């Protein structure tokens, strides 16, 4: 039959005897001795019953064309298709596998069939992934098989192993050991009778058993949940493992407990601890990992065994919540921030997610640098703000460290702030700088000699405090090229436009502290380091900048400037703002370019601008960097406001 063309079976008519009738058996006539192609189609044979002819046999249906004919070959169907078309699809949704076994077996033979290993395997496989059936909907065969007390204990106390009757194979629906549930924790199926912590079959071990670790059910499968270490009451409900933060891929020392509970609720954080643990995670926040606004999964509660346990370092990484552990003064920050915004933590190890939400309503501090990237900072920081980096509630503490380091796209040196140890070094190295012209990607050691002292963007809290004093804006960390990422004492906007001009159309994002005697800071950065001279007025600063810009060959290099080929003051200011060409060195030397990134070898001149008619140099000539100066003066005047709002909206 394997070579059957279409549905016609190749039958030799020498098969004597009565036909198989209409069932598709292919009746073959005994009268004719010639080989003929008899049809096995039930429609062809349906009229020829066994008694339909006087000879008692069916007349064979003779095809006019042999099977090798092209017309018949064209009508053939593959055997796989035939099997799919004629197969009974009931085995896919077989009711016996989807519903529990009947409580009373119909016959002993059927009961034996149900107890066969294949049937048990099929039933076990059919229950994979299904939620735990409630005790009422479970099999009632326990009661009929003498396990009535066990069934009652299963419903009342939740003790699934208290089978008092003899365990029979028909208890397979009730006995949880045999139905494989890959999503339930191994320890959570055996609930203590007094427990009832979380719902369903998972999660909440006994309330009195403080040693059982309970995992939070994270609604999304992107990250493994944190499992609170509830052994000591000092650790908060989102306490991380003692090493600091588990990587967002799960694993770590407590990876064995990271199996997800079958509770589907994102809010149900089943506390497995005795009531001493301060549960600082709000109900809408179903995971212990705090996803800060920068997508930086910093578990902010360092589980220090001997120190003041659970002290919440309020490390708001660029504008979301720190989990309040109940003992630190930053307790109000966590309640309303993340419950409405991000559902799942945005992993810093997986790029491509927009991470910055709008500033939440529950922002706690009035001048909160936590919202430095999430929204706009206040115009002036309040006076008397504690700049002590050791207090968790202070502005600069871990917040400024995280906001400064996070906004500048770099991590902090180890041990320099409370954040050290609470986050892996690569957590804050995502490209968090929203400035499209920023070259300091991934903490490139930007300045040739200047940045060596304070490893690229990593800021000390003292430098951050000095930055606040000098009016350093955290929405746009520095001027467009970020020449002074490592020098926080340099001001916000570029050299030509001081940060005090908050309403300046070119730099709308600068803000300053009031009562600063010398608010205008020279931002010029050369290979020798930043200038950082302070001036009282912008005119003095501009005249000082002319000393930086007067170097030989400027007219020649500025010939590509769109407006003028002479060294106008605007061109000088533009070069002062954007190019930071030092006074010494050949025009194309690496020290001159002061480029802040190793993978921008050609610097700004490699960026194509369609409207700049910069003459290309001769092949041996150095790269004419200021030829690209002109095109980079206008975009900030045109798009400065738009870039600012886009950065607040998480535009990358």
From Swiss-Prot:
<keyword id="KW-0539">Nucleus</keyword>
<feature type="compositionally biased region" description="Basic and acidic residues">
    <location>
        <begin position="254"/>
        <end position="263"/>
    </location>
</feature>
<dbReference type="Pfam" id="PF12402">
    <property type="entry name" value="nlz1"/>
</dbReference>
<feature type="zinc finger region" description="C2H2-type">
    <location>
        <begin position="520"/>
        <end position="548"/>
    </location>
</feature>
<feature type="modified residue" description="Phosphoserine">
    <location>
        <position position="107"/>
    </location>
</feature>
<dbReference type="GO" id="GO:0008285">
    <property type="term" value="P:negative regulation of cell population proliferation"/>
</dbReference>
<keyword id="KW-0804">Transcription</keyword>
<feature type="modified residue" description="Omega-N-methylarginine">
    <location>
        <position position="642"/>
    </location>
</feature>
<dbReference type="InterPro" id="IPR013087">
    <property type="entry name" value="Znf_C2H2_type"/>
</dbReference>
<keyword id="KW-0479">Metal-binding</keyword>
<feature type="compositionally biased region" description="Gly residues">
    <location>
        <begin position="145"/>
        <end position="157"/>
    </location>
</feature>
<feature type="region of interest" description="Disordered">
    <location>
        <begin position="1"/>
        <end position="72"/>
    </location>
</feature>
<keyword id="KW-0488">Methylation</keyword>
<dbReference type="InterPro" id="IPR022129">
    <property type="entry name" value="Tscrpt_rep_NocA-like"/>
</dbReference>
<feature type="region of interest" description="Disordered">
    <location>
        <begin position="126"/>
        <end position="283"/>
    </location>
</feature>
<feature type="modified residue" description="N6-acetyllysine">
    <location>
        <position position="213"/>
    </location>
</feature>
<feature type="modified residue" description="Phosphoserine">
    <location>
        <position position="235"/>
    </location>
</feature>
<feature type="compositionally biased region" description="Polar residues">
    <location>
        <begin position="221"/>
        <end position="230"/>
    </location>
</feature>
<feature type="compositionally biased region" description="Low complexity">
    <location>
        <begin position="135"/>
        <end position="144"/>
    </location>
</feature>
<protein>
    <recommendedName>
        <fullName>Zinc finger protein 503</fullName>
    </recommendedName>
</protein>
<feature type="compositionally biased region" description="Polar residues">
    <location>
        <begin position="1"/>
        <end position="11"/>
    </location>
</feature>
<feature type="region of interest" description="Disordered">
    <location>
        <begin position="296"/>
        <end position="338"/>
    </location>
</feature>
<keyword id="KW-0007">Acetylation</keyword>
<keyword id="KW-0863">Zinc-finger</keyword>
<feature type="compositionally biased region" description="Gly residues">
    <location>
        <begin position="264"/>
        <end position="283"/>
    </location>
</feature>
<dbReference type="GO" id="GO:0008270">
    <property type="term" value="F:zinc ion binding"/>
</dbReference>
<feature type="modified residue" description="Phosphoserine">
    <location>
        <position position="241"/>
    </location>
</feature>
<comment type="function">
    <text>May function as a transcriptional repressor.</text>
</comment>
<dbReference type="GO" id="GO:0061351">
    <property type="term" value="P:neural precursor cell proliferation"/>
</dbReference>
<dbReference type="GO" id="GO:0010629">
    <property type="term" value="P:negative regulation of gene expression"/>
</dbReference>
<keyword id="KW-0597">Phosphoprotein</keyword>
<keyword id="KW-0678">Repressor</keyword>
<feature type="compositionally biased region" description="Gly residues">
    <location>
        <begin position="16"/>
        <end position="32"/>
    </location>
</feature>
<comment type="similarity">
    <text>Belongs to the Elbow/Noc family.</text>
</comment>
<feature type="compositionally biased region" description="Low complexity">
    <location>
        <begin position="314"/>
        <end position="336"/>
    </location>
</feature>
<dbReference type="GO" id="GO:0070315">
    <property type="term" value="P:G1 to G0 transition involved in cell differentiation"/>
</dbReference>
<keyword id="KW-0805">Transcription regulation</keyword>
<feature type="compositionally biased region" description="Low complexity">
    <location>
        <begin position="231"/>
        <end position="244"/>
    </location>
</feature>
<dbReference type="GO" id="GO:0005634">
    <property type="term" value="C:nucleus"/>
</dbReference>
<dbReference type="InterPro" id="IPR051520">
    <property type="entry name" value="Elbow/Noc_ZnFinger"/>
</dbReference>
<keyword id="KW-0862">Zinc</keyword>
<feature type="compositionally biased region" description="Gly residues">
    <location>
        <begin position="194"/>
        <end position="209"/>
    </location>
</feature>
């Amino acid at each position: 039959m394997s070579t059957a063309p279409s549905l016609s079976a190749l039958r030799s008519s020498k098969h004597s005897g009565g036909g198989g009738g209409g069932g598709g058996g292919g009746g073959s006539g005994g009268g004719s001795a010639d080989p003929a192609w008899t049809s096995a189609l039930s429609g062809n044979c349906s009229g020829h019953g066994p008694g339909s002819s006087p000879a008692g046999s069916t007349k064979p249906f003779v095809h006019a064309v042999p099977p090798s004919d092209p017309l018949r070959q064209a009508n053939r169907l593959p055997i796989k298709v035939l099997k799919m078309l004629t197969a009974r699809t009931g085995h896919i949704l077989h009711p016996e596998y989807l519903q529990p076994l009947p409580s009373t077996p119909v016959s002993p033979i059927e009961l034996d069939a149900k107890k066969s290993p294949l049937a048990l395997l099929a039933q076990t496989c059919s229950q994979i992934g299904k939620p735990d059936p409630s005790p009422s909907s479970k099999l009632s065969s326990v009661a009929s098989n003498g396990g009535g007390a066990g069934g009652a204990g299963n419903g009342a106390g939740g003790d699934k192993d208290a089978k008092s009757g003899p365990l029979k194979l028909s208890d397979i629906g009730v006995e949880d050991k045999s139905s494989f549930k890959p999503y339930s924790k191994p320890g959570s199926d055996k609930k203590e009778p007094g427990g009832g912590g979380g719902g369903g079959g998972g999660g909440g071990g006994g309330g009195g058993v403080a040693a059982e670790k309970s995992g939070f059910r994270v609604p999304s499968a992107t990250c493994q949940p944190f499992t609170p270490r509830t052994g000591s009451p000092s650790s908060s409900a989102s306490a991380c493992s003692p090493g600091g933060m588990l990587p967002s891929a799960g694993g770590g020392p407590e990876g064995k407990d990271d199996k997800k509970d079958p509770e589907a609720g994102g809010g149900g954080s089943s506390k497995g601890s005795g009531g001493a643990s301060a549960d600082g995670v709000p109900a809408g926040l179903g995971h212990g990992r705090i996803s800060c606004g920068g997508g930086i999964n910093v578990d902010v509660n360092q589980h220090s065994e001997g120190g003041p346990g659970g002290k919440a370092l309020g490390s708001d990484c660029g504008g979301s919540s720190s989990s309040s552990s109940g003992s630190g003064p930053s307790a109000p920050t966590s309640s309303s921030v993340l419950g409405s915004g991000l559902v799942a933590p945005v992993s810093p190890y997986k790029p491509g997610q927009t991470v910055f939400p709008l500033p939440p309503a529950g922002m706690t501090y009035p001048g909160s640098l936590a919202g430095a990237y999430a929204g706009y900072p206040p115009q002036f920081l309040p006076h008397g703000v504690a700049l002590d980096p050791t207090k968790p509630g202070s502005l600069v503490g871990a917040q400024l460290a995280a906001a400064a380091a996070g906004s500048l796209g770099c991590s902090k040196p180890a041990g320099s702030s409370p954040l050290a140890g609470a986050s892996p070094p690569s957590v804050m190295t995502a490209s968090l700088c929203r400035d499209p012209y920023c070259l300091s990607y991934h903490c490139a050691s930007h300045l040739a000699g200047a940045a060596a002292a304070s490893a690229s963007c990593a800021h000390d809290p003292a430098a951050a405090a000095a930055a606040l004093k000098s009016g350093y804006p955290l929405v746009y960390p520095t001027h467009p090229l970020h020449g002074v990422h490592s020098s926080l004492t340099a001001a916000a906007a570029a050299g030509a436009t001081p940060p005090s001009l908050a309403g300046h159309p070119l730099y709308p994002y600068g803000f300053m502290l009031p009562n600063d005697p010398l608010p205008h800071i020279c931002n010029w950065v050369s290979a020798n380091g930043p200038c950082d001279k302070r001036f009282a007025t912008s005119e003095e600063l501009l005249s000082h900048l002319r000393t930086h810009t007067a170097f030989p060959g400027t007219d020649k290099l500025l010939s590509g400037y769109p407006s003028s080929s002479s060294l106008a003051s605007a061109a000088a200011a533009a070069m002062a703002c954007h190019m930071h060409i030092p006074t010494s060195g050949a025009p194309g030397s690496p020290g001159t370019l002061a480029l802040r990134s190793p993978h921008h070898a050609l610097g700004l001149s490699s960026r194509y601008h369609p409207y700049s008619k910069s003459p290309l140099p001769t092949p041996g000539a150095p790269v004419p960097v200021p030829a690209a100066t002109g095109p980079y003066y206008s975009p900030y005047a045109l798009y400065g406001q738009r870039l600012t709002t886009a950065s607040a909206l998480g535009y990358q």
